[in-house]
């Protein structure tokens, strides 16, 4: 009944909405229609993929300068060193690592940490639990990032009020909370109608970034000398202790880079790469170098350089545009959180969650109430607790650097096991990435006491929850399997002592088709009847994102009364059992929903001292199982056709 652990349902449901567009644009390289599709996808990528990294200039350069200052004093070499570090970090991590390598490690067109985990688990058969653990850690860190991004992004934009109208400073936090509460409150309405403007707004944002930066580069054109890596190396070597702390702040310029890979299934590789190389990367560099030039010529203006370099007549529009951009960035992260949560459910590393579709036309538009509530509460608590974006900066880096580190480790396995690269070719590249990732991770991990504990705490709790669910479902499967009777034996006994036969079809959901389903055993025990046709149904999640309808169902006739059916879904597909069973007509079984009853087992779990898990983990697993979404709704079975049979199990 549940998807197998070596299957996958990762990726983003938000990706589904763009999937059909992607297919038409990803293969042809000529023709006017393709060009228009590519432009549309590039514009869409600006609104979804680059919202997070695109709003980093608001606070990243400021935080790096604060870290680099000695006794509050910044030398020219410090400013050039910081902007040089940002340039080379964006070049090496985003342009080289993600654009040239990670984006090529797709799982049938899909990306994201869980999709990468699925790809690697399929190639590395020997240690599935190790890869599963790495994937769980990556997913947990993603959720840690998803909590911090809306908080720091919107808060940093609202801090522009301190420049526009200093008397409004006390309202920065309340205004941020109001915006975030509103954002999370409207999620259930869907974002389809407003999402169409995300791309144009972010395009305007990047133009504003580039234009404001280019204007101020002329304040001190010598700032362009920082393109030379000499300034970055000199900054790192002259004062290593200060530089080490600064590196942690420099990383803020790259937060959101993982979205390039996570949203691969939304738009495809080409639009994401082109948006980065043509628009995002140039505009980010212009803005960072513009901020550096502005500070070099206005030494006293290092407090909020992003807003301070904006002309007074444009301040209010820029604050409003920044707020819109950060809300869009937050929306992209929220959508991504829904997607990863759904993937985790399909991979059976999270309990079933209620998933609501907010669009009849676009299946990728989903809303998960529980994720929305918990995420919204966590974001608001962070804003109220930290109050300033500077205080949140320390918490931000740990989650993202950890996620990038996990990606690098899995990328090595992809290179050697899937791309069949020689170790001598893959290892130098991966070691280079690991050195950079470890430098950033270690520079951020020392900030645990400054706020890093928040992201570590969130990730740790989520790892415990996911691992408890994985471990608990395994123990439950082993426990129930011991008590189950082989299906062969039951069929043989019924052949000798046939029960009363009643008309209709009974479908019994089970995770093990070789054993008699619990619901079947209880039906025979209490009702003493057997339907004319009995289907032993198993639902499996494949290790690829999509499974074609032609490959959805496998049917084998057991005997005249019993049939074995296996339904396979991709990890990007929402299981719909009645619709999938309808496909069995071409295989010789005429499925009729009006004459079919679905028998499900509802287990009542009790903690046991002999479960093999600590008592606290038993209780946590039982809580997760009790609060899981109803199987009837999850598999989209009509409630009027369902018979639930309860059993009690000591785990």
Swiss-Prot record:
The keyword Ion transport applies. Keywords: Cell inner membrane, Cell membrane, Ion transport, Membrane, Potassium, Potassium transport, Symport, Transmembrane, Transmembrane helix, Transport. The chain crosses the membrane at residues 41-61, 82-102, 130-150, 163-183, 194-214, 235-255, 276-296, 309-329, 366-386, 395-415, 426-446, 450-470. One of its GO terms (molecular function) is potassium ion transmembrane transporter activity. InterPro entries: K+_transporter (IPR003855), K_trans_C (IPR053952), K_trans_N (IPR053951), Kup (IPR023051). The keyword Transmembrane helix applies. It catalyses: K(+)(in) + H(+)(in) = K(+)(out) + H(+)(out). It is a multi-pass membrane protein. It is found in: Cell inner membrane. Its main location: membrane. One of its GO terms (cellular component) is plasma membrane. PANTHER family: LOW AFFINITY POTASSIUM TRANSPORT SYSTEM PROTEIN KUP, OSMOTIC STRESS POTASSIUM TRANSPORTER. Belongs to the HAK/KUP transporter (TC 2.A.72) family. Transport of potassium into the cell. Likely operates as a K(+):H(+) symporter. This is Probable potassium transport system protein Kup.
């Amino acid at each position: 009944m549940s998807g197998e652990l070596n299957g996958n349902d990762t990726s983003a449901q938000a990706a589904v909405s763009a999937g059909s567009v992607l297919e038409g644009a990803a293969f042809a390289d000529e023709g006017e229609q393709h060009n228009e599709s590519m432009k549309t996808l590039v514009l869409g990528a600006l609104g979804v993929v680059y919202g997070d990294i695109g709003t980093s200039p608001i606070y990243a350069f400021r935080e790096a300068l604060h870290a680099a200052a000695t006794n509050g004093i910044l030398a020219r070499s410090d400013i050039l060193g910081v902007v040089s570090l940002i340039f080379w970090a964006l070049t090496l991590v985003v342009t080289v690592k993600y654009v040239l390598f990670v984006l090529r490690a797709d799982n049938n067109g899909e990306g994201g940490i869980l999709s990468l985990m699925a790809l690697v688990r399929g190639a590395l058969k020997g240690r599935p639990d190790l890869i599963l653990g790495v994937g769980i850690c990556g997913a947990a860190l993603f959720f840690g990032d998803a909590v911090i991004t809306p908080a720091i992004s919107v808060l940093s934009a609202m801090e522009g009020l301190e420049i526009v109208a200093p008397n409004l400073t006390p309202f920065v936090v309340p205004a941020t909370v109001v915006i975030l509460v509103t954002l999370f409150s409207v999620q259930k309405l869907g974002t389809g109608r407003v999402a169409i403007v995300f791309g144009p707004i972010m395009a305007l944002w990047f133009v504003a970034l580039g234009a404001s930066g280019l204007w101020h580069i002329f304040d001190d054109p010598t700032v362009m000398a920082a393109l030379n890596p000499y300034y970055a190396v000199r900054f790192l070597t002259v004062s290593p202790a200060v530089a080490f702390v600064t590196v942690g702040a420099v990383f803020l310029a790259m937060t959101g880079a993982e979205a390039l890979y996570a949203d691969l299934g939304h738009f495809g590789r080409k639009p994401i790469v082109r948006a980065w190389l043509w628009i995002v990367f140039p505009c980010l560099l212009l803005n960072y170098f513009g901020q550096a030039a502005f500070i070099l010529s206005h030494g006293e203006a290092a407090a909020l350089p992003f807003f301070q370099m904006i002309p007074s007549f444009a301040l209010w529009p820029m604050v409003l545009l920044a707020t819109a951009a950060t809300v869009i960035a937050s929306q992209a992260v929220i959508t991504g959180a829904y997607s990863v949560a759904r993937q985790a459910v399909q991979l059976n590393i999270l309990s079933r969650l209620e998933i609501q579709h907010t669009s009849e036309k676009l299946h990728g538009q989903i809303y998960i109430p529980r994720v929305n509530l918990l995420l919204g509460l966590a974001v608001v608590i962070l804003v109220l607790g930290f109050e300033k974006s500077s205080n949140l900066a320390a918490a931000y880096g740990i989650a993202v650097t950890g996620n990038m580190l996990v990606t690098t480790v899995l990328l090595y396995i992809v290179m050697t096991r899937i791309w069949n690269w020689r170790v001598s070719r893959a290892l130098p590249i991966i070691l280079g990435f690991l050195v950079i990732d470890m430098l950033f991770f270690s520079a951020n991990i020392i900030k645990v006491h400054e706020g890093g504990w928040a992201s570590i705490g969130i990730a740790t709790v989520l790892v415990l929850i996911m691992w408890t669910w994985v471990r608990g479902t395994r123990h439950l499967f082993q426990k129930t399997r011991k008590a189950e009777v082989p299906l062969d034996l039951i069929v043989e006994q019924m052949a000798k002592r046939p029960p009363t036969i009643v008309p209709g079809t009974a479908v019994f959901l089970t995770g093990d088709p070789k054993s008699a389903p619990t619901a079947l055993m209880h039906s025979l025990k209490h009702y003493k009847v057997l339907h004319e046709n009995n289907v032993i149904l198993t639902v499996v999640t494949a290790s690829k994102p999509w499974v074609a309808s032609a490959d959805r169902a496998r049917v084998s006739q057991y005997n005249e009364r019993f049939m074995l059916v296996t339904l396979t879904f991709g990890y990007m597909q929402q299981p719909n059992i009645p619709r999938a069973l309808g496909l069995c007509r071409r295989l010789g079984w005429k499925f009729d929903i009006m004459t079919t009853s679905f028998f499900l087992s509802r287990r009542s779990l009790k903690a046991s001292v002999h479960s093999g898990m600590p008592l606290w983990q038993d209780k946590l697993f039982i809580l997760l199982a009790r609060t899981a979404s109803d199987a009837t709704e999850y598999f989209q079975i009509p409630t009027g056709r369902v018979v639930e049979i309860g059993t009690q199990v000591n785990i």
